[in-house]
Amino acid sequence: MTISDHPETEPKWWKEATIYQIYPASFKDSNNDGWGDLKGITSKLQYIKDLGVDAIWVCPFYDSPQQDMGYDISNYEKVWPTYGTNEDCFELIDKTHKLGMKFITDLVINHCSTEHEWFKESRSSKTNPKRDWFFWRPPKGYDAEGKPIPPNNWKSFFGGSAWTFDETTNEFYLRLFASRQVDLNWENEDCRRAIFESAVGFWLDHGVDGFRIDTAGLYSKRPGLPDSPIFDKTSKLQHPNWGSHNGPRIHEYHQELHRFMKNRVKDGREIMTVGEVAHGSDNALYTSAARYEVSEVFSFTHVEVGTSPFFRYNIVPFTLKQWKEAIASNFLFINGTDSWATTYIENHDQARSITRFADDSPKYRKISGKLLTLLECSLTGTLYVYQGQEIGQINFKEWPIEKYEDVDVKNNYEIIKKSFGKNSKEMKDFFKGIALLSRDHSRTPMPWTKDKPNAGFTGPDVKPWFLLNESFEQGINVEQESRDDDSVLNFWKRALQARKKYKELMIYGYDFQFIDLDSDQIFSFTKEYEDKTLFAALNFSGEEIEFSLPREGASLSFILGNYDDTDVSSRVLKPWEGRIYLVK
């Protein structure tokens, strides 16, 4: 029996790949202007290759006014000048391929910038041919002060109403995110065709191998854009998911997009897509090979554990059991199907995983970072690693609001200040929340060296666009970790080698079973491939603890662990210790 005899494990390059995510503003500055750029990425391709990575995913580098760090695109076919030129990007794609890696780019097509020519035309008059390319609605009415009332009660993902009033034609436009990130109307066929040609076709013609599809579940809104039912009784505005997520035509749109990609590529290369769908009720539909939608999806269930569904910065207590079940939900849906999964715990929208899910204290930062590496590398699905994760980066310490760059943080700070005051309990809770959960924790510049003040990200006399995390002074940087065999960086390299060596079990393994599900310290499980069984025993606590065998009398053959000085035959795990075994 071979891998391909299992429908859910038909071999594909993108299933077996480890994909390294790059946030261009913060990766490497090549020209000392304080911003990362495409030439900076090109200069570090060998470093990425040496990790054991098979593909890179580069976050948006397109022309943009940068209200939301490039996720507000004003021209899909042009590189933002601060990042370089189109020729710089073509060179990056070419050199990535020459090193044997694939190139994946971000596809941001739920919305565009209000500076895009499409929107400029649309807003010019109610009779413009592109008027219906966006969601325009008249006010629901006017309040006592004569201010226009938004068309419905949807809340923006970034706080406040999801509608912005435009005085040009005295109507509102829908924008589920920032005020100048206007939602495109996929119901309009001409709009869809323009999106496909400009945002997709142009880059396929220049050799990209795949797309991470941003906000992939939002393209089909609930018809008529009605008021949302009241889920959050503390607010007049309601989370927009009810009206905007997984709408009636969402799968039709993704099938249409898939057909466009397949027809556009003439050289036989297989294009992969990973859809950011947020929550997973439709994951098996999105990823079924027979349905021709997307290759795989990102779900948020496991990274949203410990947060409120109504406000992402409200910290909610959670148990290890809850986190285990959330993680498993990312891949259990593929059992017995032709679907596929992903495994990740960090990206540009999440805080650092060691701080959130392990122990970022000096005593356990390194060992618990390796524990998370073991967990992620042992899970079924395509593996994603975010820049800085491979060196065990942690959250920065608490900063005043002036130091934050994230538009989401800034918007919500102003809303809370206006509603409750700067010294309110709500504001104190907000600062606790952003200290743990802000997206900015993942967006600080990459520390390449130990050199002050800028850790090799940019020149020593340059002010970087964003403050560096001072952890580079405590050894969390590429230079020092490269020379330390015991570093998180070198452990990642060994773990990725093991993942390739045991790919049948680690990448394609099925029949996942928890061993100690109810334990709030031990994360242990088995999974199988043919007659082979993998067993993982991971201690998510600062105490020594005994783990249970997968079955009585089981014989274990050690594969990899995060402690060098441990008795791998012992059933007692040290604090934050993890081991991976073959079961005989």
From Swiss-Prot:
PANTHER family: ALPHA-AMYLASE FAMILY MEMBER, NEUTRAL AND BASIC AMINO ACID TRANSPORT PROTEIN RBAT
The name this protein goes by in its record: Alpha-glucosidase MAL12
Miscellaneous comment text of the record: Present with 5060 molecules/cell in log phase SD medium.
Organism: Saccharomyces cerevisiae (strain ATCC 204508 / S288c) (Baker's yeast)
GO biological process terms on file: maltose catabolic process; sucrose catabolic process
Gene3D superfamilies assigned to the protein according to its UniProt record, in alphabetical order: Glycosidases (3.20.20.80), Golgi alpha-mannosidase II (2.60.40.1180), Oligo-1,6-glucosidase, Domain 2 (3.90.400.10)
Cross-referenced Pfam families: Alpha-amylase
Keywords: Glycosidase, Hydrolase, Maltose metabolism
GO CC annotation: plasma membrane
Site feature: Transition state stabilizer: D349
Enzyme class: hydrolase
InterPro entries linked: Glyco_hydro_13_cat_dom, Glyco_hydro_b, Glycoside_hydrolase_SF, O16G_dom_2
Active site per database record: D214, E276
Catalysed reaction, written as an equation: Hydrolysis of terminal, non-reducing (1->4)-linked alpha-D-glucose residues with release of alpha-D-glucose
Domain of life the protein comes from: Eukaryota
A GO molecular-function descriptor: sucrose alpha-glucosidase activity
Family the entry assigns: Belongs to the glycosyl hydrolase 13 family.
Enzyme nomenclature, EC number: 3.2.1.20
